[in-house]
Swiss-Prot record:
DNA-binding region: 229-288
The entry's keywords: Developmental protein, DNA-binding, Homeobox, Nucleus, Transcription, Transcription regulation
Pfam family, one: Homeodomain
SUPFAM superfamilies: Homeodomain-like (SSF46689)
Protein name from the UniProt record: Homeobox protein Hox-D1
Listed Polar residues bias regions: 319-328
Phylogenetic lineage: Eukaryota, Metazoa, Chordata, Craniata, Vertebrata
Length: 328
């Protein structure tokens, strides 16, 4: 929502020439509480312009301005919480035609230290050098807040709000000056993030991000090594093991056709049967090696000759090669 100022010419109403600067109702509070604004200096002999803020319940500004508004003596508040703001209007006699023709420019002049933005967006008119300057900013009174930008009071929450854009458009369609005021470095208050005030105990540590039951292959993948998906161990049933052992008893090696047939009968896949036979052959070779070592250990002492005895001599009989005779 862009903020704007409504400029109404009242030179033909009531026979009193002048201009009226009013604020749209959307910039005011929801209740019908008027805001009294004090002009910075006398506004002339009745032919000058005056600055007013409409009541919040009014939809359109009053077409007839007062003849000569007197300067009210309003004492300033004792200790305002925020910086006060004044709406200043300056009008030089004889410049009413130029203002009505759209030759006057408007500008925002900041006065508060917190949310002010320096910059004068006023430019002298081409005819006679007459110009009008308006200084606006947020008005914070004791009873509530009066925001020209139409936004929420972000200062109360500790968060900065968006700056209003300065827009000027003349009533008769003549092009006007348009410029957006940007804050100077250092004048904008530092934003207070709610997450910045949290202690370090609420932050996420590195050990919280690591999986507790990470496998060794997963750890190798963290250091750059490729970790293939580990195969799940197959739990064979008793019937499956019996059939596989029976087939292994007859055939240590299976053809591909026989392997596929067994896999279909036992509700397994080809790879599971292949791996089982590989492991079974390795187990068989291991058992054979252990059996040879177990039989070779007790036979070795019997082959050594006994002390004090002569070795036995076998004499072959040509008639009966299988019989042997001992010497007498």
């Amino acid at each position: 929502m862009s903020s704007y100022l409504e400029y109404v010419s009242c030179s033909s109403s009531g026979g009193v020439g002048g201009d009226v600067l009013s604020l749209a109702p959307k910039f005011c509070r929801s209740d019908a509480r008027p805001v009294a604004l004090q002009p910075a200096f006398p506004l002339g002999n009745g032919d000058g312009a005056f600055v007013s803020c409409l009541p919040l319940a009014a939809a359109r500004p009053s077409p007839s301005p007062p003849a000569a508004p007197a300067r009210p003596s309003v004492p300033p508040p004792a200790a305002p919480q925020y910086a006060q703001c004044t709406l200043e209007g300056a009008y030089e006699p004889g410049a009413a035609p130029a203002a009505a023709a759209g030759g006057a420019d408007y500008g925002f002049l900041g006065s508060g230290p917190a949310y002010d933005f320096p910059g004068v967006l006023g430019r002298a008119a081409d005819d006679g050098g007459s110009h009008v300057h308006y200084a606006t900013s947020a008005v914070f009174s004791g009873g509530g807040s009066f925001l020209l930008s139409g936004q929420v009071d972000y200062a109360a929450f500790g968060e900065p709000g968006p700056f209003p854009a300065c827009l000027k458009a003349s009533a008769d369609g003549h092009p006007g000056a348009f410029q957006t005021a940007s804050p100077a470095p250092g004048t904008y208050p530092k934003s207070v993030s709610p997450a910045s005030g949290l202690p370090a105990a609420f932050s996420t540590f590195e050990w919280m991000k690591v999986k507790r039951n990470a496998s060794k292959k997963g750890k190798l993948a963290e250091y750059g090594a490729a970790s293939p998906s580990s195969a799940i161990r197959t739990n064979f049933s008793t019937k499956q093991l019996t059939e596989l052992e029976k087939e292994f008893h007859f055939n240590k090696y299976l053809t591909r056709a026989r392997r596929i047939e067994i896999a279909n009968c036992l509700h397994l896949n080809d790879t599971q049967v292949k791996i089982w036979f590989q492991n079974r052959r390795m187990k068989q070779k291991k058992r054979e090696r252990e059996g040879l070592l177990a039989t070779a250990i007790p036979v070795a002492p019997l082959q050594l000759p006994l002390s004090g005895t002569t070795p036995t001599k076998f004499i072959k009989n040509p008639g009966s090669p299988s019989q042997s005779q001992e010497p007498s």
